[in-house]
Amino acid sequence: MSQKSRHLALSLVPAAILAGACAPQPAATTTPTPVTLPAKIGTNPFFVESSLPYHAPRFDLIKNEDYQVALEEGMKQQLVEIDAIAKQTTPPTFENTIVAMEKAGALLTRVSKTFTGVVGANTNDTLQKIQDAEAPKLAATNDAIYLNDQLYQRVKSVYDRRSAGNLDPEQVALIERYNRDFVRAGAQLSEADKTRIKSINQELSKLSTDFTNKLLAGTKVGALVVDNPSQLVGLSNDEIQTAADAAKQRGLNGKWVLPLRNTTQQPSQAELTNRAVRQKLFELSTLRTERSDTNDTRSTIRRMAELRAEKAKLLGYPTWAAYALATQGAKTPENAIKLLTDLVPPATARARSEAADMQKLIDQQGGGFKLQPWDWQYYAEQVRKAKYDLDESQIMPYFELNNVLQNGVFFAANKLYGLTFKERHDIPVYNPDVRTFEVFDANGQPLALFYADYFKRDNKQGGAWMDQFVDQSALTGWKPVVYNVANFTKPAPGQPALLTYDDVTTMFHEFGHALHGMFSNVQYPTLSGTNVPRDFVEFPSQFNEHWALDPAVFANYAKHYQTGASMPAALVAKIKNSQTFNQGFSMTEILAASLLDFAWHTLPAGSAPQDVDAFEAAALKRYNVDVPEVPPRYHSTYFSHIWDGGYSAGYYAYTWSEVLDDDAFAWFREHGGLTRENGARFRDMILSRGGTVDAATLYRNFRGRDPSVEALLEQRGLKSSDSIAK
């Protein structure tokens, strides 16, 4: 997998939880109406603001049962506060309505943000039961706010007079965001339609949680279990030991377990020499939630697609995709689909050429079989070795996790932005794997708190993501508390954590999101940090990936974990020369997943398919991404991004943002690359602005023009393939 094939979702917990608190979520130290706390205040750490630095969560005090009590009380408090705002007799103003809403729900925000982080990265049966019980209630609380006509009339009054007062641009942006969100929630609908919207939201919240639980269980159960290490020939001794340790953790002594990653293709397929084992691993991956058992998600996703289409129709949109993209940079599904389909010819042409190279190698080796999806990773690695004299085992000793983090990711942030980092061992964490760092600005002032949780666990959702326990806001005076989560293979005890190059770029990617949150410099929580359109939020993260191969950065972290020797220049050259290798596959699997997402979410109301597999096959064929050897990065039944990750009709955002990030990096190359001056400009014009300015305007101000797709084609090595429509 290439750097651009890694995915990141800001969070992979259910969207019902993400949006459960008043959306946009507030974060405040005061509330407009005094609320009497229950007697349990003495034992529940959520009922008081954290006394830790940066108001970090009190993981040393929080017990599982505290979440449910605090969520329930938080919802009650918020509704009392909102009711007081709605029923004011004084005329609506920016302060008594909009700012009051920003300050409402402090307890609910505090607990929901913490719960979101823990249930995604360190869940258990108790937390899952709480999630099941509370998600519908959180959705109902959200509806009680955004479908409150009395409250909406106050918001609308402020909105209608936004140009008449002495409001600054950020205040106007906040008013416009609130009005937009009320309208999109259904505030202008009839009472009958509001009732139906509430019912749909309740069911969707339950289905989203249902999907999450099924996928987590299906992924765990779907792991490859082998009885004999001879089946694992090709894996390193450390990898085989890690598989043995994974089996022991499951009570399977004397066996070996390869846990599934969240994607269709599995990293181990690149090394396993036994073709039957590769096939078995591939099939376990693709069928993880499609076995007609309790973890089967087919009925869940059909119903979700059906309900989303119905909701969109009630809100005046022809499809869910039209509704979802109305607030995005792409504006319409047609615009997003055009970008994707324009990229299909060069991507699939390259993929077929890559497949031909592999088939030639198979034939030369007397394989006697046709290349299949489970063969791709293995033979791609063989071709890479032949073409570039490079294989993963050569480079992993130079990518030790802590070295990559501190001398790579942090080093680049220092050179660009002047940041420094100090590990804190006194901040409690939710799992022993988690590390905490205090981040200081160039002037030495405290900027943020950063949590790093990189190793795979069975109770952690798949993939990698960033989110925040605390949002930056001048209104509250709070600084950001940010976390990165990944699923890197945990080494055996006493062994170093050695990363693939793909893992390295994942670290840079997620930290790009973290910087977006840390550098936020806005007044209001709703507009803070990563609260931007989905097809813009991936821009800072994907942009940050580019620094992984910057000569100065790479030389600082790519050092042998045993000797400390820098990676030999010849090996560095091989890595750089191979950057466009396998890009046909990488681009095609992403395009296939993105277009599959649109196939589901451009369905009109009442047309959800009965046969998921047949629908998917027809969609891939319709969009000309049905390359047999290159399945979608995610099949429908385990496509977490679009069913429970907040990216419904939004997976295209990675490609849309890639146009921005490659084009922006071209600007950096033209202006001296890794310099503090360039970093300051990017921070000031992009990373610090949150959602206070239209995303397209932000980019245009930074670049001096609209983005061009040319840099993406060059970065991917696709310019020599079939021409692309401009």
List each model region and its residues:
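Short His/Asp/Glu-rich catalytic/ion-coordination signatures at enzyme active sites or charged loops
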Residues: 51-66, 115-134, 157-199, 259-299, ...
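Bacterial N-terminal signal peptides that target proteins for export
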Residues: 2-10
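Active-site-proximal, well-structured secondary-structure segments within enzyme catalytic domains
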Residues: 170, 174, 203-206, 213, ...
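Short pre-active-site segment immediately N-terminal to the catalytic Zn-binding motif
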Residues: 489-508
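C-terminal, non-catalytic "cap/extension" segments appended to globular domains
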Residues: 35-62, 66, 234, 242, ...
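N-terminal helix-rich structural modules
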Residues: 28-242, 668, 726
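Bacterial signal peptide processing site
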Residues: 23-25
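C-terminal motif of bacterial Sec signal peptides marking the signal peptidase cleavage site
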Residues: 18-21
